[in-house]
Amino acid sequence: HWLNYIDGAWVDSVQRLSVNNPGTAEPLATIAQATVEDAERALQAARRCADSGELTRARPAQRVGWLLRIAEEIRAVADEGAWVLCQENGKSINDARDEFIEAARYFEYYAGMADKIEGTSIPLGDGYMDFTVYDPVGVSAQIVPWNFPVSICARSLAPALAAGNAVVIKSPELSPLGMCVLVRAIVKAGLPQGAINLICGRGREVGAH
């Protein structure tokens, strides 16, 4: 049985979703089915993290370190994650492993950008001062599809963290387990509490919220 990750802890829910092996149509595992209340808790946790400044005001070099550590942790679980993703999604084991490696590369790529988010200053003449500063949005909510869940999750999660945003991710009901392996690896990097939250629920309920 797999859990949601909210506010720095793996948590269960009253209801469960069944995840089936598409090759056999047989049940593979269950995962906690997040409710609207769970989604709200995740959003509030992300907002607290953003408001605390631990992530949004962290020095760029610190965010670089976090993202590189995340990439290392993802590579370390690539074989385990590939087996999980293969069973729940129907990919070949090689394609599933490549998806985890691709996820790690996204974090490596955006680690290289995390300390290069620069403002601009345009000289407009006497009496004018013109400059642009980029600030984190605060909270990024991301809904991930079933077909490339690990890769697509990393593609949007990595830049959000690089820019200093806290994130709430809704995983797909059909193949949420590989993303649990992904987040378990990410957590080891030591991000601030509430920086990343993972929930699995029905799109018409949790996703719509």
Question: What are the language-model segments listed below?
Answer:
Residues 22-24, 36, 160:
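Short connector loops/turns at beta-strand edges and beta->alpha or beta->beta junctions
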Residues 119-209:
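Rossmann-like NAD(P) dinucleotide-binding subdomain of oxidoreductase/dehydrogenase enzymes
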Residues 13, 39, 78, 96, ...:
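Alpha-helix N-cap/helix-start motif
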